[in-house]
C-alpha cells in the first residue's frame, strides 16, 4: 500500500496540500473530515500507510488508490566522523536523486534541502549545474526531504536552508508553497525566521518573494559573479 503514482500523474499530491486542502479532498471522497487531520499528522511524521494504525484499512486503501503520496526514500547516507552532520541522497518516485544535509548545533537542528533535480543557472563553481536542470521538484518533494531527515534521525527539525541542488527562485511556485507548508502550525511548524532561501541572484524572484510578506532570510551567492568578465561585472552591492 504505497500510494505512489508515476511522476506527472493526475492523482492529487496530498503531501503538497495544506491541512485545510487535505480536509476538503478527504471530504470529497465521502470520508469524515477528522480523518484528514489524522492522515496529516501521520504524513508529517514520515509514516507510510501501513504505519497509520489508527486509520481504518479501507480508508488507507482508498487514499492509496486515489491519491499520490510521495515520500523521499533514503538511497544513501553519509555520516560525518567529526560531528552529527549527515548527508543524504534521496531517491524520488521517478528515479531522480537529490541531496540534503542534516546538521546539528547547540541551538538546534537544520536541514539543507534541494529545490530542483539538476540546475540551469550555469555557475561553474557548482557541480549541480553540470547536467543542467532535469526538472523542478514539487512542494511535497522539498518538504519530504525535511520530514525524511527528521524521521531518520529521530529529531525535531528547527530550521531549513534552501541551499541544496537547484535554484529555489527558478522553481518559484513550489518554493513558496513549500515555505507555507513547512512553517504551518498544523505541520512541522518551523518558524519562517529560521528558514533561509539561497539564490544566485534572480531579481524578479527576489522582488516577488519580498511581496509575499514571509520573513525568511534571503542569502545571495556572490560567487556567481566570479566568472563574469570585468567589463560586465556589476558594481559591488
Task: Describe the function of each predicted region.
Residues 26, 43-47, 127-130, 164, ...:
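Short amphipathic alpha-helical interaction patches enriched in hydrophobic/aromatic residues
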Residues 54, 211, 230:
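Phosphate-coordinating loops and pocket residues in cytosolic domains that bind phosphorylated ligands
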Residues 1-109:
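Flexible, acidic/Gly-rich N-terminal and inter-domain linker regions that tether
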Residues 226-237:
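Single conserved hydrophobic/aromatic residue that forms the stacking wall/gate
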Residues 117, 223-224:
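Short, acidic/turn-prone active-site loops that include or flank metal/cofactor-
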Residues 96-216:
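Conserved Radical SAM active-site core
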Amino acid at each position: 500500500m504505497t500510494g505512489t503514482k508515476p511522476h506527472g500523474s493526475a492523482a492529487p499530491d496530498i503531501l503538497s496540500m495544506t491541512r485545510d486542502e487535505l480536509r476538503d479532498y478527504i471530504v470529497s471522497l465521502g470520508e469524515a473530515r477528522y480523518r484528514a487531520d489524522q492522515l496529516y499528522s501521520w504524513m508529517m511524521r514520515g509514516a507510510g500507510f501501513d504505519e497509520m494504525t489508527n486509520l481504518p484499512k479501507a480508508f488507507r486503501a482508498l487514499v492509496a488508490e486515489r491519491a499520490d503520496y510521495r515520500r523521499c526514500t533514503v538511497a544513501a547516507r553519509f555520516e560525518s566522523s567529526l560531528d552529527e552532520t549527515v548527508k543524504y541522497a534521496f531517491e524520488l518516485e521517478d528515479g531522480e536523486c537529490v541531496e540534503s544535509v542534516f546538521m546539528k548545533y547547540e541551538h538546534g537542528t537544520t536541514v539543507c534541502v534541494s529545490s530542483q533535480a539538476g540546475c540551469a543557472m550555469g555557475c561553474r563553481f557548482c557541480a549541480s549545474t553540470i547536467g543542467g536542470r532535469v526538472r523542478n521538484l514539487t512542494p511535497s518533494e522539498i518538504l519530504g526531504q525535511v520530514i525524511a531527515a527528521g524521521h531518520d534521525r529521530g529529531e525535531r527539525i528547527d530550521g531549513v536552508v534552501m541551499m541544496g541542488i537547484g535554484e529555489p527562485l527558478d522553481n518559484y511556485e513550489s518554493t513558496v508553497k513549500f515555505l507555507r507548508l513547512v512553517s504551518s502550525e498544523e505541520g512541522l511548524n518551523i518558524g519562517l525566521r529560521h528558514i533561509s532561501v539561497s539564490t544566485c541572484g534572480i531579481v524578479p524572484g527576489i522582488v516577488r518573494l519580498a511581496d509575499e510578506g514571509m520573513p525568511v532570510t534571503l542569502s545571495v551567492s556572490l560567487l556567481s559573479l566570479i566568472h563574469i568578465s570585468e567589463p560586465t561585472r556589476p558594481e559591488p552591492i
